A protein has these predicted regions:
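Short helix-boundary/capping micro-motifs
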Residues: 14-32
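A short LG(V/I)-centered, amphipathic sequence patch enriched
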Residues: 44-61
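Alpha-helical linker/hinge and terminal dimerization helices associated
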Residues: 46-47, 68-90, 303
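Central regulatory/effector-binding core of bacterial HTH transcription factors
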Residues: 93-156
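Hydrophobic hinge/microswitch elements
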Residues: 131-136, 140-144, 149, 217-261
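Secondary-structure junction motif
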Residues: 194-216, 286-287, 303
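A late-sequence structural motif
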Residues: 262-304
Length: 304
């Protein structure tokens, strides 16, 4: 058995397991599928063991593969920390790489980032606004180091910390002359009104799907006319009288204050949820990353 392991091959193995799909991992790593398969085979040859069992359902770890995967997680985190710290040594300005779900990233965090920046002008801050699933993926790919999402990921390699509660509201256009201007409906009536939802891999979709299931209702039971991947696009549709949608209060606060949108109460359904800061299990925050997290968790965060 070889004493040295190729870290690139190890990363390819790690990504294949995380995505349970060779083609998906190859796409993310910018490799061809044969190229990725070759790297996996080379890693197995280096270690002298079989790591993966391939099937139509994806890949399955062998007992040896489970051991190597745990070490891969740790080693890749250490590698990321080394690269980050070496880069910081040769840069005058520390960096924050943040990924945030759209509800927080578009409506709340900009003001918080501004406030934090006012107190720490030496920091360069880069934030990507994505849906929650993509935030998790970029965190695990080491593209970002701090994530903020709309649900608690079911991943043992991710640490979560709740930061704030919110509520999903059913909203419609506030217009007494329009047929979409209603203020209260039953669960039965919910199945009839035209709905515009967020896309399937978004945190908002996950939260409402879970809430409806708790009441014995499924998305398929609803009159969903289309889905969009942008809260702003959904609000434009609602304001044009196209239908209703479930959106976080954080995303519709201004429209509610102005009276452009109104809340539609649903009998026996209140959908509350939390936003979470997420991090990789073996990742060590830099001084400024920890300062930013402490700030976001505190009452001084100053959400918009």
């Amino acid at each position: 058995m070889c004493c040295f392991v190729n870290l690139e091959y190890l990363k390819s193995f790690y990504m294949t397991v995380k995505h349970n799909n060779i083609s998906k991992a190859a796409e993310i790593l910018h490799l061809t599928q044969p190229g990725l398969s070759g790297q996996l085979k080379s890693l197995e040859n280096e270690l002298g063991v079989t790591l993966l069992i391939r099937s139509n359902k994806g890949v399955e770890l062998t007992e040896e593969g489970k051991v190597v995967f745990d070490y891969a997680d740790t080693l890749l985190s250490i590698q990321g920390n080394i690269k980050r710290d070496l880069v910081n040594l040769h840069q005058d300005r520390p960096k924050l790489l943040i990924g945030a779900c759209k509800s927080v990233g578009e409506y709340a965090l900009p003001c918080s980032i501004y406030t934090f920046k006012q107190h720490h002008k030496e920091v360069d801050i880069h934030m990507e606004v994505l849906n929650s699933t993509d935030v998790v993926e970029k965190l695990m790919d080491h593209t970002i180091n701090i994530g903020i999402v709309q649900f608690r990921p079911k991943n043992d390699d991710i640490l979560t910390k709740p930061i704030v509660s919110d509520e999903l509201l059913l909203v419609g256009r506030s217009d007494s002359d329009n047929e979409t201007s209603i203020k209260r409906i039953s669960m039965g009536e919910l199945k009839l009104i035209p709905l515009i939802l967020r896309e399937h891999n978004s945190g908002t979709f996950y939260v409402i799907e879970k809430a409806l299931k708790s009441k014995g209702l499924h998305i398929e039971d609803l009159n969903v006319i289309y889905d969009l991947n942008s809260p702003e696009a959904i609000k434009s549709s609602i304001l044009s009288g196209k239908g209703f949608s479930f959106l976080p209060r954080m995303a519709v606060e201004q429209e509610l204050k102005k009276g452009n949108l109104q809340i539609v109460q649903i009998d026996d359904l209140k959908v509350c949820f939390k936003y979470y800061i997420i991090s990789r299990k073996n990742y060590e925050y830099t001084e400024y990353e920890q300062m930013f997290i402490d700030f976001i968790i505190s009452s001084k965060r100053g959400f918009c």
